Each structure stands twice: as C-alpha cells, then as structure tokens.
Amino acid sequence: MKKRILTILVPLFVAVLWLAGCKPEYTTYSGPNYILFSDTLYEMAVVDDSAYFNLPVVATRACDYDRNVAVEVIDAASNAIEGKHYSIESNSVVIKAGELVGNVRVKGYHSNISVYDSLGFKLQLIVPENAEWDLYGTTANVLV
C-alpha cells in the first residue's frame, strides 16, 4: 500500500515542480503613448547649495526616437522664486530612444531658504495633446 502511494505521489510532486519552473508571462502595457510626471508631489530636502534632485518624467511606451518635452513653471501656483530658492537645469527633458524615463534636474539653494519657509512651485509639461493622459495630467507640485 505504501509503495502504491509513493508511486502516485512522487510523479505528482515532480510534475508540480516542473510546472512551477516554467517562465511566467508578464503583462505589458499596450495602450496609447502618454508622457507625464511619475508623481504629482515631490519633496526636496535641501541640505546644501550643490545637490540636484531628479524629478522623473515618464512615458508609457518606449519609442525608437528621442522625445523632447518642454517644462515650464506655473508662477501663479508657486511661492518659491526661481533663481533665488531653486533653479531648473534645463527647461526641456529628453526621453531617449528605447527608454521610458527622463529627468527634470532641480537644485535648491539652502542659503536662501529659512527653516520657517514653506516654499513650493508647480511644474507643467508641454506635450502634444495626444500624449496627455487626462487621468493624471501634466503637472507636478514640488515642495522645497
């Protein structure tokens, strides 16, 4: 009786191990190509005047060409002053061919920020209308 149970269980165990060893199928995104900030709120802990922070700009699909995206500061929604409290390295971001991420590089000026300040600014991506995802939008708030 024990031999018969082992004869059934051993092949069953081997079959389970064989099936578990198969490569899983990964679900990939196949929808439209959108460009957006990876988050809608970023916090920069500015500790010196030389550190840069990367604010990721992401695309939902990789392309075989470079994508240039313009970045602008919305002054009406900002209380930090560009050039005094922070600076943006470039007003454009490049998402390179075959990649999904480009970065807006921002530097904060610690010497011009008081510990009592509550500063922030709002960024907006300038993208073609067909690359704008209505669900997430193209803006991000940055707290300094």
At which residue positions do the language-model features occur?
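Bacterial Sec-dependent N-terminal signal peptides
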Residues: 1-4, 14-47
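Ser/Thr/Gly/Pro-rich, low-complexity flexible regions
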Residues: 1-7, 142-144
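First exposed extracellular module after export/assembly in secreted or surface-exposed proteins
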Residues: 33-144
